[in-house]
Amino acid sequence: MNSTPGDTRDAPAPSHPAPSHRQCLLPSVAHTPSVTEVTPAKKITFLKRGDPQFAGVRLAVHQRTFKTFSSLMDELSQRMPLSFGVRSVTTPRGLHGLSALEQLQDGGCYLCSDRKPPKTSREPGRLQRKSPSAGQAQVFQGGHEAPETSYSWKGPVAPRRLTLVKNGDPRRQQTVVLSHKNTRSLAAFLGKASELLRFPVKQVYTTRGKKVDSLQTLLDGPSVLVCAGNEAFRCLEMENDRGNRTRKLSSVTARSERGCWGPNAKQSVIHSRGRSGGKLRQVSLTSERSGLSDHPASGHRAWAGPALDRCPQDMPVPPGSLVAADDVEKKVCMNEDGSLSVEMKVRFQLLGEDTLRWSQRVGQASVFTAASGKGQDPREADRFCCRQEGYPWGILKPGAQGLGSYDGGCQEAFDVGQKSQPSYDIWRNPLATPEGTGPTPRRRWGLAKLSGCKSHWRQEANHRKGHDKDNLSRVSTPRHPRSVQPGSCCPWTPDGDTGSDTLHPVSSASSHNETDLESGEGLCLEDTGPHGSRPETQSTERALSDTSVSAKSREESSEGGGQLHRSSSQARVMASREQVTKGDNPCISTQSHLPLNHMGLQTEKYRQGTRGWEVSGEPELRLALVPGHSGSQDTQRDALPAPACAPAQWRQRKQKRPASVECLPSVSVPYQVAQKGHARQDHYYRDTQSSLDTALQMPMPQEREQACPGSPAPQSPSNSPSAGNQASEDLRSPFSSSLDLQEPQATSKATTIAVSGSDCVCHSTRSVEPAGDTKCQAHSSTPTPAHRGELGCLWDKAGTTPEPFSFSVLLDRCPEADDPRTYHDCCCLQAVPSSPLAAPSGQTQTSISEACLGGSSFCPTPPKEQTCFGRESASNGSTSSGHSRADGFAGPRRTLLVKSPGVRGSLEEREADGGVTPSALPYASPDAVVREWLGNIPEKPVLMTYEMADENTEVPSDGPEGPKEDSLKVLGEPSQAKQQPPEGATNEHPEPAGVLSGPGSVCCRLGGDLHPDATSGERLKAPAEAGIGEGARVDHGVSLCALPTKVAASTQIMKALLGSKPGRPSSLPEVSSTVAQRLSSSAGAFIACLARLHFFDESLGPLDGKVRLEESPKYQEMLRLFQTLWPGSELWQGQLDFSLRKLTSHQALLGTEDFTPTSSSGVDVSSGSGGSGESSVPCVMDNTLAPEKRDLPLKIPSQRPDSRNQGYPELVGHSTVSSVSQVRACATGGEETGKGGRKQTWGNAPEQSVHSTMLEGDALSEETEGRVRERLQENSVHGKGLPEEGVRVCSQEMLAAGSQDGAGSPEDTRVPTDEAGADAASGGLWPLDGREEPTESPQHFSESNSRVREHQSAHKLELGLEEVSRLDARGCKQACIKASSGTMAHKGSLDPDPIWVSKLLKKIEKAFMAHLADATAELRARWDLHDNHLLDQMVTELEQDVGRRLQASTVMEVRKIQSRAGRMVPEPPREALRGQASLQTEQRRRRLQGLRNFSAVPGQGPLSLTLEDGPTLKTALGTKSGAEPAEDEFCPCEICLKKKRTPRFPKDAATVSGAPVRKAFDLQQILQSKKGGSSNREAMEVAPQRTGRMLSQEDLGTVQGADEKQGLGVAEGEEGEGKQRLRAEEDPEILKTEGSGCCAPEEDEATEEDGEICIGTAQESQQLEGTEMGKEGTLPQSFRDGGTLEAPARQGTHSVEIQEASRERQQEVEGRHQDVKEDSPWVSSGESQGRVGSENTSLDQEGRLLNHHQRPGPQSHHTACSSRALSLDNSSQVSQKGSDGDLTSGDLKCTKAKNSRVLHAEKKVPVMYPERSSSEQEVPSSPRLPKQGKGEDEGSAGSLACTQVGGKVDGFGQDDLDF
C-alpha cells in the first residue's frame, strides 16, 4: 500500500482524484504536469501547522529528487518537529490536502501536519462510501485494516499503538506507542523496535509480508508489524502452525486490531452493520487474529482457518465475485464487557488457480481448525473446490481437511474422512477443539491436481486420529446407504447423512463413489454414471467397505492406544456368494457378515458426528474375511462371488474410485482400502514413498476374476483357507494404501498381503500404479499413475499404527479386458511382509517391498519409495504366463520390488499415468520444497537396516510355490521366501529388453522376455527366488528398513526434478567423459571417506560374512545417484579403497549393480561398451541373478557362471558384481571389457578400484608379491605347469586385478588377481594361492566370461591364491596382463612427469610473481606511494624472498615426485647417475642413428611408449585402467585392439612421450632404415640400445617390441609410431607365436585400456628380437623381455642378436636375468633356461602366461610375437608393476625429456642394468627382483622385473634406458 491511498482516505482529493473536485480546489498547474518538458525544480516552503514560530523548510522539489509524494513527506518528516511526522500537506488555508507532486506550485507555501486533514463537510458521505473499499484494499494488502482510516474518523484521539512481532517468533511481541521521537524517521522507528524486541530490527513487514519501506507506509499501515533483521520474512501463521497453536497475540494486539474481541470491535461492528451488505471492511475477531498468521502464503488471502473468516470485502474480488451475497452470514454478539463483536460466515467459491492456492492455505491453516476438530456441515464445506491431499504420502494433517471440488449437482458432504478431520470452519474458534479429539499431529498437505474433467473432488483426508481404542473396527458400518443417491456424486448414507454429517467411510465407497471422488483418480464421474461407479461396482464397493475391517479404526486405536486390535478390527466378509449380489446389488450384504462388534463400533462411530470425521472418508476396505481365515469364527470361507464387470467398468472404477474395490473377490479379501484423501489424479506420487501402501493382497476368487472380462481366464479361486489365518494377522498391518482392489485380485492367500496361490486376477492397467496402491487395477485410464493418496494413506496408517509388520503386496494385475493380451502375468501379488520396522515415530511403516514387474531381481528400494508396479510398458507386456493360480501354489508371485523415486513405473507407464513430472508436482515454492525436504530429515539418523536375503529367506519357502501363509504369519519376517526359480525362471526374470527403467528407478517391467507361458506362479517363484534367494530382500532391504513415516514429498520432488521425466527434457546435461571421470573420482573419494567413517556398516549387516562395500544398499543408492547425475562416468564401480571394500554384508544388492547408467536421453551409456544391447536395460540383467547365489556369494565359487544370467552375458557381469567377493577387477577388466559386459558392474570399474589400489597399491603390491611368490614357490608352479614367469605374471595379474577391481580389500586385491586371472582365462578361476591347485579346469576358460566372473565372485577371496597353479596358462596370462597393466597405468598416472611438473610450477611461480607485482603497483597507486623508496625496497625484498621460497618449493616437489618414482629402484648418487645417464644417452643416440641402417623393417616403427606413457595414453584415450571405455566394447581380438590403439597411440605417444626431438628424429631415421631393409641384426642391436633404456621404462613393451623386430626396434621417441607398428605387426606375431592370438590382443587391449603401453619397449624389443632373440629366449627376462627373447630364439636370430648387441648389453641382460633368477624363482627357472631355444619356447608359453598377467603391463607386447610378446609382457608387467608399486609409469618410462630420462635412468638403471656401471643399482634391484619373481605382485615385482628385463633383453646398458 502506498502512501497515496492513506492520504486518500484522509484527504478526499488524493485518493481517487475526481477531476471536477480537484480542479475546483487545486491550481491549474497541478492538472498540467509537464511530461515532455524537463521542468525546473520547484522552490517550495513547507510550514508547520499551528506553529507560527517555525521558520519553515524550503525544499527544491523535482521529479528526480522526489519520485513520489510519499518520499517528499518522508523528507519533511525528518525536517519537521512533528510528533507523528508529516502526515498531511495542505494548502495554506488547509482547505484541501495535496497528494501529488504535480499539485505543488513553484514558490508556494504549504502547511504540514501530523494529522490527517479534516474532512470537509462536502465530502463526508463520499468518504464514508469510499473508505470501505480503501480499507478493504489495505486489509488485503497489509493484512489488517489501515488504522489511519479509524483515525480519520476519530481524529487523533489517542496516540497510535503498534504491535511488533518478531519475525519467525510470534511469541515475542511488544507494543510501541508512536510518538514524535520514534516517528521522526523510519530509522528512528527501527531503533525503537530494536530496543523493544531486543534484537537489531532492519526491516519491518506487514503481517502479509509486505515490506514497510517508508515512514508514511508505517504510519498508514496495519497495527501489527513483523520486525525482522536481515532474514527473509516468515509468515506468522506458519510458525503458529508448527507450534500447533493458534495465533495468540497479546491482548493488546487483539484489542488494537479492530474486529477482534475487545472495545475496538464496537466501532468496526457499527460500521460493518452500517454497511449491512457486508460491504464495509469488517474483520471478524477471528479473522483479525488470524490476520497475524493467516498469510503464510500470501497472495491469496484466503488461507484456510482463521483467515477464512475474513470478509470477502477484505479481499480483492476476482472477476467473478468469490462471495455471493447469500453466502455471508453475520451475527452480532454482545460481549461480557459490553462490547459488540460480529461473527461472519462467508462461503467462498474459489475460481481457477485460486482453488489450488486456497487449498494449500487451507491445509496449512487446518492445523488450527484441526484443533477445533468440529465437523463442518458437509453442505457448507461442499462448496469448497479444494481437496486436501494428504501429506506427501497422502498423510492428511489430522486437523486439516481437504476440500473436494464440488459439483454443483452434487451436494456432496464431506466424507466421514472429512468429518474425521476437523471440518473446515472458518468461524470456529481455533482454540476450541471438539471433545474427544486432541490437536492432531500436523500433516503435510499436497494439492490435488484438478482433473481436466469436472471431477468432483472430495476430501479424501483420512483422519486416522481421534478414534478411541474402542473404535477398533472402523469398518464402514453395515448400514451403508444402500440407496445411493443416483443424482448425487457422493451418496450419503441415510443415517450418517444428516445425523453425523458424515458419510460412513464404509458406505463412502459406494455412497460417494468415494472411490471415484476420493481416489480423485478417475474423477470423471460421468463415465460411471451419476454415482460414478457402476451399480455393481458400487454394491461391491459397499460390500467391501462394509466388510472392510475398520483397519483404520485399528490404526487409529493403535495410534490412540498404541496397540492394534487385530481380531476385532478384522471384519470378515461373511456374506456367502448368495448374499453377495454379483453386481447389481447396490450394497453387498456382506456388511451383515462383519463382526457385530466391528459393525456396532463403526456404526456408533459413524453415527457420531464427532466420530464421523474420524472415519476416513475413504472406505478402508479390509476384507478380513479370508476363506481359510481362522480369525473370527463368523467369517465364512465362502467367498463372495465377484460381480462381473466390464473391462470398461473396471477401468472407470479404477479411474474413478481406486479406493473402492471394484469387484469383490469371491473370496473375501483381507484388505483395507484406505482411500487417503489423495486424488489419484494427483500425479504427485507420494505413495511412492509410502511403503507398498497397497501391501495387501486381495485374494480374489476365480469367479471374481472371471467376472471381470478383463481377466483372460477365470482365476483359480484365490481363497485359500490357510491364507485366511494369516490374513487376519496381516490385516493388522496398516495397509492404508487405498487399494483399488476393485480389480479382482484373486490371491488365494487370505493373508493380507500374502498372495494366495491363486493369482490375483487383476487387470493390469496400462497406467502405472504407484506401487503405493496395490490396486491390482492400475488405473490405466487414470492419467495419474500413482494413487499417491492411497499410498499416502498407507503411510499415514503405517506411521500411526504400531504394527510392526507391514506387507507390501504387489497385486497381480490382470491386463485390462480391453487389453486383449490380458496377460495373466499379473504382478502376482506377493505378500512381502516387510520385516517389522520401527518407524522413527515408533510406528511401523510398511516398508515397500517394491516389485519390479520386470521380474528382475529386486531392486533395493527404500520403503519410502513406493513400489511402482512396474507394469509392463503400456503394452502390458506382462507375460501371460498363466496366473500362478493355475499352479495353485499360494506362493506370492514374483514380487518385483521397484524402486521408483517418483513411483517410477516403466517409463511408458509413468508417462501414460502421468508419472511424477515437474508439472505434476505440488504447487509449492522452491523454498517450501527445500524447507520440507530439510524438515523431513530425521533428527536422529534412521538406522537403515537393510535385511539381506539371508534374513529375508527366513520365511520358509514352501517350495516352488513360494512363501506360504507361514511366511506371512511372521509379520516381521519378509513374506518372500526363497523360492527356487522355476526352470528358466531366472532367465525369465531378466527381461533386459522389457525393462526400461531410468537410472533413478530400478523398477523393471516384465519384458516380453519372460515366458508368457510360464505360470505366474513360476514367474513369481522366479522373481521371488531370484529376488529373495538372491537377496531380493537385499533389494527390499532398503524398503524393509524402517524409514521415517514422513517420506518427504520434497524428496520425491527432488528426485523427479533430477531424474529424466516424461514432462521435461533430459534432467541434467551430460558431462564429458573427462568431467565425468573427475566427478566420479571425487564421488568415489567421498564414498570412501564415508566408508571409513563406517557410514555403510549398518547396511552391511552382520560382520560374519565378508562383503564388499558396494554390497551396501546405502552405497549402491549413492552410486546410483551419482550415476544418474553423471551417466557418462564409469568410475563408479571400483573407486573405493580396497580397505573399504573389505566389508561384510549378507549380500550385495543386485538392484544397484543392475542399474545401468543411462544418458539423459535414456540411452544406456554402458551399452556401447557392453556389446550386448541388453546392457541398455538398466536393471534387468542384474535383477535376474539367481537368489540362491546371492545368498551365499562366498559359497558360490563353483556355481555355473551362466546359471543366473543364461543368455544374458551382461547379467553375468552384474551377478559377478553382486557376489561381494567376486573378483571384479579381473573379470570385469578383462572379460567384461572383452565381452562388452557392462562396465557398470562393480568389478568393471577398475578406475575406482584403481584409484584405491593406487593409494594402497604399493604396500599391497609388495605384500601380495611376497605372498604370491611364497605360494608359487610352495606350489612349485613349474611342476604344476605354470612357468615361473607365469607365476610372477599371475601375481602381477592379481595385483593388477585388485587394482582394477579397486573394489576389494587388500584380500580382495589378492583374490581379484586370481579372479582376474580366471576372467582373463575366461576358463576357470585359478587363484594364485599355491596351496591349492586350480579347481577350475581349462574348459571353464572357454566358458563365458560371465561364468568366470561368477566363479570368481563365488570364491575369489578363499580360492584366489590357492587355485593359481591350475589356471589355464593362457587365461592366467591374459588376466594377469590386463590386471597388471591396469594397475600400472593407474599407478603410473598417479605421479606426473617431473619435467612437466617442474614446468608447471615454474609457470605458476611466474604468474604469482606477476600478480604480486601488480598488487604492489596497485597498492602504490592507491596510496600514492610511487616515490616511496622505502616501499620500493620492501617490495623488492618481498618479491625476492617470495621468489626464492617458490623456487625452493618447486624443487622440493620435483624431488618428491622423483623420489616416489625411484622408490622401486635404489638409486646411486645422483651425480654418478647423471653422468652414467648422459653417457648411456649418447651411446643410445649413436646406436639409434645407426639403427636405420640395420633396421629389419625400416619403414615401420611401433610407437615406443614407456610405462609412464601407458597411463598417459590411457588418459588420452579416455580409457580407464583396468576397464574398457564404456563407449567401446572391449574386443579381445587383435584387430580391434589394433584399431583402438592405432589412433590412440599416436596421440598418446605424442602426449606421453617426452623424448627429446633428437630422439624422435633418430627414431624416424631408424624406421626409414628399417624400411630400407636393414638387417634385423643391426636393427636389433640398435633396438637393444634403445630398448635398454626403454625397458627400464617399459621393459615389457620393449621386449615384446623386440620380438616384433620390425617396429619394435624403433626408438622410444617414436614410441607412438612404434606402437602403431607393434599393434599392426606384433599382434599377428603374438597370435602366431603364442598360439593365443586372441589372448595377446586381449592383453594388448587390456594394456591399452590400462593405459600402460610398452610401445617403446615393444619397439626396442622388436629390434632386440633380431639381436636378442636368442638371448631373450635364454634370458629369464623373457618374463618381460622373455616373450621377445623367445620369439627371436625361435627365429634363431637371438644368437645373432646377442652377438650384434653390444657385449655390454648382453652382459647387462645376462646379469639382469641372473638377478631375476636369483630374485624371482620363476624368472630364474624359466628365463635363465629360456636362453636355450627350447626354453625360449617354454618362456614363450610362460611369457604368454606372463603376458596375460601383463595385460595391465605391455599391451603392445601382446601384439608382438606371442611368445616374445608374452614373455615381454611378463617382464613388462613386472617392470610396470615395479614402477606402479614404487615408480609411476612415468618413472619407468624414463621421462621423455632428457632430464626425465636421466631421472628414470637413475631409477631404472640399477635394476635394468645390473651388469653395467649401474650394477650397483642392479644389486639392490636384484633383491627386489626376487621379490618380484616370487610375488610378482603388481607393484614392486613388476617394476623390478621390467627393469631387469629391459636391461637384459635390450642388452643395452643403462644408457639405453636412460635418455
Swiss-Prot record:
GO terms for biological process: cell projection organization; intracellular signal transduction; photoreceptor cell development; photoreceptor cell maintenance; visual perception. SMART domains: DCX (SM00537). It holds the Pfam family DCX. Its main location: cytoplasm. It comes from the Eukaryota. Residues 42-126, 160-239 form the Doublecortin domain. Residues 716-728, 870-883 have a biased composition (Low complexity). PROSITE patterns: DC. The keyword Cytoplasm applies. Residues 130-139, 499-512, 535-551, 734-750, 1241-1252, 1336-1345, 1567-1577, 1756-1778 have a biased composition (Polar residues). Required for the differentiation of photoreceptor cells. Plays a role in the organization of outer segment of rod and cone photoreceptors. Interacts with RP1; has a synergistic effect with RP1 in photoreceptor differentiation. This is Retinitis pigmentosa 1-like 1 protein. It comes from Mus musculus (Mouse).
